[in-house]
Amino acid sequence: MERELRLGIMGGTFDPIHYGHLVTAEAVRDEFKLDKVIFVPAGNPPHKVKRKVTDKKHRYLMTILATITNPFFEVSSIEIDREGYTYTIDTIKEFKKMYGEKTLFYFITGADAVLEILTWKNADELLRLCYFVAATRPGIEGNKIDQELDKIRKLYGDVIYKVTVPSLAISSTDIRERVAKGRPIKYLLPEPVERYIQKYKLYKEDDSR
């Protein structure tokens, strides 16, 4: 009997995408035996309204450049093609239509986001449509996160998991700040992404792209 398709969904602004994202996606893919991981650059995320987000075209192309050599990785424009704010519930519903109801979806997110899942739009419905995988790093204080995981499991069953991934102290915020200050970003992200940032002069102090 053929098993159901298992797809990982990795959403994020990817501003820019870096090795931390890629290592996390690969670790979760291996742990849950996913057929592929689909990276979904956010279009107009409601939780990022406090800072200026780089143009979605640049973020989408950088994500393609970063993932193109991995046959298990794919990039979707499903959110950047959508008008207005982009919500996870709408994205999962669209993927359900594309891949069928029998497909199992695993939404990959940072452990800190677990603390906010129940506040997401239509969280109740969302937690019934897909599994959640919270990626944590070794040494991270996890009591608060574990408590939230237990709370969600009591309400919805085994729909959320925690996976410890190799620790990489890399963040998109740090990369943007380093570029703005003229500091090197080599070994923090794939070379094609670094060249793209240089070519289009992204993350400069006066960047208006």
Curated annotation (Swiss-Prot):
Enzyme class: transferase
Top-level taxonomic group: Bacteria
One of the GO BP terms on file: NAD biosynthetic process
UniProt EC number: 2.7.7.18
GO molecular function, one term: nicotinate-nucleotide adenylyltransferase activity
Pfam family, one: CTP_transf_like
Catalysed transformations (reactions): nicotinate beta-D-ribonucleotide + ATP + H(+) = deamido-NAD(+) + diphosphate
UniProt xrefs under Gene3D superfamilies: HUPs
InterPro entries the UniProt entry points to: Cyt_trans-like (IPR004821), NadD/NMNAT (IPR005248), Rossmann-like_a/b/a_fold (IPR014729)
Pathway: Cofactor biosynthesis; NAD(+) biosynthesis; deamido-NAD(+) from nicotinate D-ribonucleotide: step 1/1
Keywords: ATP-binding, NAD, Nucleotide-binding, Nucleotidyltransferase, Pyridine nucleotide biosynthesis, Transferase
Keyword Amino-acid biosynthesis included in the entry's annotation: no
Lipid biosynthesis in keyword set: no
Family per similarity comment: Belongs to the NadD family.
Protein task: Catalyzes the reversible adenylation of nicotinate mononucleotide (NaMN) to nicotinic acid adenine dinucleotide (NaAD).
PANTHER family named among the record's database cross-references: NICOTINATE-NUCLEOTIDE ADENYLYLTRANSFERASE-RELATED, PHOSPHOPANTETHEINE ADENYLYLTRANSFERASE
NCBIfam families, sorted: cyt_tran_rel (TIGR00125), nicotinate (nicotinamide) nucleotide adenylyltransferase (TIGR00482), PRK00071.1-3 (NF000840)
Name listed for the protein in its UniProt record: Probable nicotinate-nucleotide adenylyltransferase
Encoding gene, per UniProt annotation: nadD
